[in-house]
């Protein structure tokens, strides 16, 4: 019987394979009879226009669609500059060789394409901003970050944060797929710019929201890079190596490799690099310091994969290893406002941080049938690092010195974390639109750290601490969410019912020891610290539970859609603290939050829309904020946790409008948002007579308000060769806190520091304005770009009634000359001027230049680059708190030059034909190929 069953099964498999057929043909230009390369071919189901398979013609105009099941289909053949070709075909029991397909020219499209530079820089498609990458020229060996810096409305900070028209980008996708789990710098600083066709800025829904059609709290603003169609089958990448010297005769080097293996929708990318020029090509392994705070040396290697196994199963993931070493040197000033008094402090700090990190993430999507989708996502992370720092400081009250001192710290840490998410979605064939979705996830983390601290402070007396602290913590969480979607009287009216549960268990142990041996810090041996410090040691256990009950309604019309919902979120917190003296204190807290949520979107057309949305969200305090134990590692700032904290609850509302004019290629978009937070987590600061502050996180009884907005306009002018862009940002923010001066806090009393007295209410209100203008001129032989930025900030604190204003002016210009013999000259210059930054008001002019020579039949590029030729680069930051304004100046990389060589790996469609030859033979060049695939809207879910 068993053998019979196996035989029958094999027979069915064989019959299914035999039933699959091949469709092939050749595409020609109807006017000259020449075969057409890189023409897009799509096969759709005749019943519902579902895409079954796609292909592109080769250099002979030939295409083949493999393993097509019998049935009725629509074949669509399209290429820019030609009219589409459509043919209804029926596949039965034999292969089909269609007659030659003749594409006729689209006269109107050709007129537009004949004028070079007519491609719009920016197109608005609903809620998606789409930049045309080929409208922006970059160096031959440029990476994606170089391309992003040229896009109107895009800003990249020194820390690598990307904002588009004032909105922060959270993650990166490539062709709709995860690339190193959204690690922004892994994509922007490794991928070659010339592979990119479109840059799409959009809001990415979570996997569950894509399956249910109802948005949740996990929607993020992302960038999706679509690759050029001729880069989707083959091997391509860049290998770059360079070396040079800086002004201090220190060797500077930069080596990087990125190789991509593409097979349609399946892709594998290998990245590796090492440098000491502050180019952090991954956010992983960085530790707590910023990308450009000081001098950084990094090494990284990673592998990313997305594989379409078959129609039912997709698999992907990534693994990476990163190491970084950072040396930072900072000078900072801080002005703290108290009632009737002002504290000023000046600090000098040096630090060395060394960090290693390894990550593995896997992901799979299985569709056992057309009604069921299963997604699983495991991940694990390991991190270890060491740190050393030295700090000296001086504090003044009303310009009189109150204390001064120095501190030395050294430590190490290790942590491991992981998680697993499982999503199951089931549609019901008995009623279209009905679905049941379950999302279950769990995660854990464990960490251990050791810190050695030697500090002394001089005020009215001298205080010295010589201590060793060991911290261990572990965390485990389980989350479950079930959604049932039910169409009402028709598919335009849909109701979603959601039940969710979240549980988090945390345990944190802190043991502190002191030593009278003054050499103990230099030895850094825990055994030298033999005095257990009860007041600064404890064991904290915390359990947090949250239940969510949610009801959402969605109404959809062709022109508009509406979603309304209500959510109730009860939460319970149970904690117990075991102190070093053996005593323990329990704590229990229960709260409930109610929040409506809604969204309304009106589509005036495919290129114009208006949206209004609102959402409420709960944020749980961290263990460090809740753990009720004193921390004296900083003699001028002692902290203690607050186990009585409530979760904060934010109310967020936003208005968005976008439009695109197809006649003028002009784009307009604007957004305004507001956020009000209930029970916001703020800081309570108590100052003693020496300027030392005791701090504790508390819930604010005021409602912090944040209002922000942006207006963007982009249009081509002067025969569409010159592009103009303006982006305006406005903001209003209030920060609350509590502050009290000259209070005598009994440091030896555990009860006193745990129940820190509440200070006077302090708040800082801040107005901000930013205007950015840009012009770009593009020609075959020359490109000129100019960008101007003005930023204004106005800050007022209620305790000092003192106004703080800062002004920033930045003018950026770049020029590219393409000379004979494959030589390119590049130069960019940035002028910036700062006013209002305390002692750091300075001007700087940053001038970079390079000359590139293409060799080896355009596969290699030899470059000479000079960075910061005038030696003026600064690194200054401003930070505004509820009762303070601070300014920090970091050390930065000095001027240097570098000679480098880059080699481009190109092998497409089984041919080793040079990529530049391909583009010279192409009828319209690189900027005129069909668009890449758009990310899925509500229906797809492979872009996570």
Question: Can you name each region flagged by the protein language model?
Answer:
Residues 212-213, 281-287, 327-344, 352, ...:
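Outer-membrane beta-barrel translocator domains and adjoining extracellular loop/strand segments
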Residues 45-50, 72-88:
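A short, solvent-exposed loop/turn motif at the edges and junctions
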Residues 31-45, 122-124:
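Short, ordered, surface-exposed loop/turn motifs in non-cytosolic proteins
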Residues 46-62:
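Short, acidic Ser/Thr/Gly-rich low-complexity loop/linker segments typical of extracellular
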Residues 494-608, 797:
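Signature of Gram-negative outer-membrane beta-barrel scaffolds
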Residues 20, 60-62, 76, 83, ...:
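Membrane-proximal, glycine/serine-rich, low-complexity loop/turn segments characteristic
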Residues 36-37, 64-72, 80:
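Short Pro-Gly-centered beta-turn/loop motif in secreted/extracellular proteins
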Residues 348, 477-479, 531-537, 640, ...:
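Outer membrane beta-barrel strand-and-loop segments of large Gram-negative receptors
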